[in-house]
């Protein structure tokens, strides 16, 4: 390291939605210079997408990303950088040779039981089936699921899907993993209930490029914060007194000194079909144990408004497999056992002793966030933590 390095006013580690939002706000509000570094070769974090030339599909590289929010502040903010399609997310599940709508609703119930229950009749049925374990304290996820929606629906749609997600028999999983299982006693199969919903009209990556389209923001990709050979490394920035917004894994920041936080990860297997549409929907869950993957994503079906620019004779599907993450895997979902929560609380105490570093995002705070929640927490963190640091 030489004295010749001219440091920016702020370094953001991670070019995901949290980091991009903070960088955009810092430049807009204070006119500072910001350097964003990311170990990956693209911006956008897990929301990054790219176009598949053969099919005309927009591939969500890290799995399906659907934007939805009821937060007016977030909706107004994101609409500064993109407009959204009218896409409404609906999910279907294949079970025992039939396709059902999800979340479980009156249509699912009547199809499953070959009936035509009214809302009140369906509710009475499910309450009765859920009463199988009445008076007991569920000791595992299996019992909790049955106590919430009854054995027939739980075993059809939840049990094996959950076993595949966790690679563990639900009877061996803690009941605390599920707080509730939504059942709708009407025919509404909209997946999300938020006020606003859609997909960015010209893609996720174009949206995020516009967020940082400012000469005062510089992005350096394929750059590791912990690599001492590059100028924006942890030790050099600390020595120079440069404020840092860190969105990488919080345990990695502290060199795993207290132990590793546990995550689940996802693997994808790509399948191409010589037909224009394979599933007829964007996401198909597979609820049965004999299909090894949890769900399949058919990306073309997220964007029906692009039909004319898509290949009518080809489609691409990603099958999604879930497993426990090991070091080096992409962490997706925090496992959040009681031991993990206690470990994160100890890392949080260490973080408080880092006055020039603001921790954020899923990895930096060991939380699962939807996109709108990441943006909301980033706007708040900028106002409450980052701007005061920059004004010192």
How would you name each of these model-derived features?
Residues 55-131:
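Dinucleotide-binding Rossmann-like beta1-alpha1 core, especially the glycine-rich loop
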Residues 21:
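Short alpha-helical segment within the catalytic ATP-binding CA
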Residues 24-53:
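Glycine-rich FAD pyrophosphate-binding loop
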Residues 29, 226-350:
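Mid-domain catalytic core of redox enzymes
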Residues 3-18, 35:
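Beta1/beta-strand and adjacent pyrophosphate-binding region of the FAD-binding site
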Residues 96-101, 106-242:
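Active-site/ligand-binding neighborhood in enzyme catalytic cores
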Residues 330-392:
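C-terminal catalytic lobe of FAD-dependent flavoproteins
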Residues 15, 247-249, 361:
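Glycine-rich, N-terminal phosphate-binding loop of Rossmann-like dinucleotide-binding domains
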